[in-house]
Amino acid sequence: VLFVVRFFHRFEQRQLPPRKKADHRPTAIFAYNDLVALGCYRAITECGLTIPTDISVVGFDDIAFAEYYQQPLTTVIQPTVEIGIKAAEILIHKIQNPPFAEQKKLVLKPLLAVRSSTSICPRK
């Protein structure tokens, strides 16, 4: 199930099917950032559901208070220091090798901080 959220932190109750329609409800939500994930918390509880028993929630970017929220948020941690270092190295290389510095593809591995907003899916 894909949810499109217009505002960076807004996730509304009407986007989730009610508890009685469990077959049509997602078992997990992977939000594109932690603020949207935390916005999901309110919508989920307003539906009478619990995290992570009914729905697991995962964010992306590990904002400062994600681990201190009422239900610590499982989130993907970007290697921001490494991103900065690699970006600076690429920029220096391009400056020192104009005008046709080669294109570089760089893949950095994120980390998953598993906290208490996720659990094993109880349904098939």
Question: What is each stretch, according to the model?
Answer:
Residues 1-10:
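Short beta-strand elements in bilobed, periplasmic/extracellular small-molecule ligand-binding domains
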Residues 13-123:
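Flexible loop/turn connectors
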